[in-house]
Swiss-Prot record:
Biased composition (Polar residues): 535-547
Cysteine-cysteine disulfides: none
Domain of life: Eukaryota
GO cellular component terms, A-Z: apical part of cell; bicellular tight junction; cytoplasm; cytoskeleton; cytosol; plasma membrane
Gene: EPB41L4B
UniProt protein name: Band 4.1-like protein 4B
Organism: Homo sapiens
Main location, first listed in the record: cytoplasm
InterPro entries the UniProt entry points to: Band_41_domain (IPR019749), EHM2_FERM_F1 (IPR030698), Ez/rad/moesin-like (IPR000798), FA (IPR014847), FERM/acyl-CoA-bd_prot_sf (IPR014352), FERM_2 (IPR035963), FERM_central (IPR019748), FERM_CS (IPR019747)
Region of interest called Disordered, as start-end residue ranges on this chain: 23-48, 400-425, 492-519, 528-547, 706-750
Amino acid sequence: MLRFLRRTFGRRSMQRYARGAAGRGAAGLGDERDGGPRGGPAAAASSSALPAAPGGSVFPAGGGPLLTGGAAVHISAAGAAKATLYCRVFLLDGTEVSVDLPKHAKGQDLFDQIVYHLDLVETDYFGLQFLDSAQVAHWLDHAKPIKKQMKIGPAYALHFRVKYYSSEPNNLREEFTRYLFVLQLRHDILSGKLKCPYETAVELAALCLQAELGECELPEHTPELVSEFRFIPNQTEAMEFDIFQRWKECRGKSPAQAELSYLNKAKWLEMYGVDMHVVRGRDGCEYSLGLTPTGILIFEGANKIGLFFWPKITKMDFKKSKLTLVVVEDDDQGREQEHTFVFRLDSARTCKHLWKCAVEHHAFFRLRTPGNSKSNRSDFIRLGSRFRFSGRTEYQATHGSRLRRTSTFERKPSKRYPSRRHSTFKASNPVIAAQLCSKTNPEVHNYQPQYHPNIHPSQPRWHPHSPNVSYPLPSPVLSSSDRLPFGIEENGGTPFLTAASGRHHHQHQHQHQHQHHSNYSLSLTLENKEGPLRSPNSSSKSLTKLSPGTPALFSEAAAHLKKLELETVKAAGPWPPLHININKAEEKKVSEKTLQTPLLPSPVADHVKCNILKAQLENASRVNIQGGKEESPFVNINKKSSLQDASVRSPIPIRVETAQPAVEKPEIKPPRVRKLTRQYSFDEDDLPPDLAEAVGVTTSTTTNTTTAATQVSVPLPSPKVQNVSSPHKSEGKGLLSPGAKSPSDRGGAFTLEPGDLLMDFTEATPLAEPASNPHCAHSRCSPPLSLPMKEETTGVCMYPPIKTRLIKTFPVDTMNPFPDTFTTGPQFTADFRDSKLQCCPGPTSPLIPAATLRPLTETVSTVQTIYTTRKPVSLAASAETLRQELEREKMMKRLLMTEL
C-alpha cells in the first residue's frame, strides 16, 4: 500500500508524469513507461551532448579529448528486464561505451561490464567516477545500487579512471595496465592537476612520441610534428623544439619500454598519485588535504606544511561537515602525545566523501587483506557510517594475480591539432622564432638568447647556441671559414671558439693569450670575465661590446674597429706585426714578442718609463762599450725572451747627455715585503715554511769579496728592519753596497748580449747579502733558500732535478753612486748525473765527464708580468753604471725566481 502511494503521489512520480504530458503535447513522445525513449526527452537530449568530466568541464583543461577514441560501443546487459538503466562510460582513450543494465543494478555490475570490454586483468587500481549536482567528484561504490548513488540521470555519465596510483609502477605486470596508467598521467598533466618541472615535462613528452610514433626519422619528422600534439596546458614553441631534440635521444626504445620509462620518471613527481581535497581550518583559511600511499599531506596554497603518516593517525571521523584527525607524535622526551586537527568542508556529503576516500587509501596501501566487512551488531542499533573497504589491497593485487600468456591490445593515436603557422618561419629563422615564442610564455626558459642584429641582413646569420636542426634549411649552412666574420658575440659573452679562431699560444711555462690580426677575423680572449674590459682612457669606448643599432656591413664594422684600435694604441706607439711561429722551427725575433694585448694597451706608468729610459740609454751607449764579456761554462744558444723590445716600448727618444747623476737625490724606496708577496702571489701572513724561515735570517756582513765559498741568501725583511744605506755610508763602514764594484774587478769591462737588457723587472726585490754557509741549490734541500757558489764542491742534491737558468757573474763596482738592492751573484750552473742535481758555480767537477753534462739553459724560461706602483728614479750618470745596475738586477731576479 505504501509503495503504491509513493509511486502514485510521490514528487518524483509527479515530475515524471508532467514531463510525459509535455512531451506528448509537443512531439508526441512520452516517458519510457509510456512507450517513449529511455529517460524521456531529457535523456535523449543528454545522450547527444558530451558529459561533464570530474574536473568540472567536458574534458580536461587543455582542450578536447587526449586521444581520438573509437566508435561508440553499445553493450546490452539488461537481459529480459523491462526497466533498464542507460549508462555512458568514457574510457581513457576517449572511447564512449554505452551500457544497458537492469534497474536495480549495482556499481559492481557496471564495472564488470567495462572491465570485460577492455579485457583488463589488474582491475584493483581503477574505478568509475561521476559528478554530483555540486560538481564534486565521487567514486562509484560497487556495493550500492547505481540509482541511489547518482542523482543526475538517466542517462548516467561516468568516467573510467585510475583510482589508486601504484607506488611502484614496476609492479604492474600487464603492459596494457601500464599503458592505461600512462594515459591517466597524460590527462593529469594536460589538465594541470599534476604539476611537473619543465625538464621533466619535456622528457615525458619525448617518451610519449617515442611510444606512439617510434623512431625519430630526421628527414620525415620535424619540429612542426611536435606542435600537433598537446602535452601541457601552456605549450610553447620553444618547448616543442626541446621535445624534438629529446625525442631523438630516445632512439631504440620500444613502446613498452618507453611507457615504463615514462612511469618511472613520473613516479618521482611531488604530486604523483595525490588525491587533493579542499578544506577549511579553524581560522577560516583554505587548506588542501592530499591522500597519498604514505599518509595525508597538508598544503597551504602551494606550500606543503605537514605530513601525517598512516601509522600515526589513530582516529579519523566526521560529523556533518566537520572532519576530525587525531595524530600521535613523540615529544622531546620521547613520550607520545595526541594532537587533534579539525577541518570543515562545504557540506556533509563532501565531508563524508573525503572520509571515505581516506579510509580506502589507508586500507589499499597499508593492509595486506581487508578487514571483516560484516559486523556482529545489528544495523538498527549501529551508529555512524556503515561504509567499509570491500576491494582487494595493493599487496593482494601484486602477489595474488595470475599472468596471462598472451594479451593483445591496440594503442589509440593521440588527437592531432593544426601545426603552428609560423613553424616554417621558425625553420628558416630559428633564432627569431625562439624569441617570439619566449615572449608569449615567460615561464618557459629560452633555448636561445635574444638576437640583436648588428650584421647586414644579406649576411648569413649565426648564433653561438644555434640548435642542431635536422630538417633542411632554405639558407646555406655556414662553414668554419664563413663563420669567421662573426667571431665576436653581440651580447658580450664568450666568443664562438672553433679550431680556426681562439688559438692559445703557449710560451715557456705560462699561457699567454695574444690578439690575432687578420683581414677577416677578430677574436677577443679576455681573462677578466666579471665585466667588460675598457681602454685606459675614460673617454674610449669598450671594445668587447658592439653597438646593436643600425646594421652595417662587416667591412664597415672592421674599419670602425681598426679606427678604435688606432686611437687607443696611439698613446703607446706603433706595435709591430705579430709573427706566429707555426712550424716551431724558426726562432721568433725579439721585437715581435709581447706580453700585452695590442687592442687593450695600458698607459705607460712613471716607473715603467724609468726602465724604458734605462734600456734606451744602454742601447745608445752600447757602441761606446769596450772590452770583453765574461762567459760562463755553458753558453745559452737558444736564448729567448718574451718581453717586447725596448725600442718599441719607448714612446719618446731619449738623449744620453740629459742624464744627471743620482747622488744629489738619494732614492727613497718603498717597503718591499708587500711588493715581494704581491709579486710572487704569497700571503704576508701565510708564507711557505722555507720562505718564512728565510725572513728571520739576519743578513751577515763581510769585507772579503774574494772568499772561496760565497752564499747568496734571500731574506724578506719587514719594513721596520729594512735599511737602505747610501753608498757613502757603506764605504765608510767597509761594506760593499749592492751596486758597488770590487777593486779587483773594477777594470774589467764586459759587453752584453742583444737580449740581456730586455727583461723589464720594475718590481723591487729584497736585499741579498753574502753569507758563508754553503747549501744546496734549491729550497728542497735546505731551509735557508740559499745557493752555493763554491768553486770546488762535490755536494750532490738527493732530490730529482729541477729546471733552472744559467746565472752569470758580474764584477762589482764600489764607485757606483746608485744604491742597489742586489748583491753580487757568482756564476751558477747545474749538472745532471744519475737523476740527481749537482750544483757547482765554477768549472765542472773532474769527477763528472764533460760529455754527460746537459746544460739546463735549454729549457724554456718563465716570464711573469709584474705590475707595481714603484716611484720613478732619476737617470743614471753614465751608461756604464746603468748597464751594470740593470744587469745585476736581472741576474738577481733570475736567481730569486729559480729559488722560489
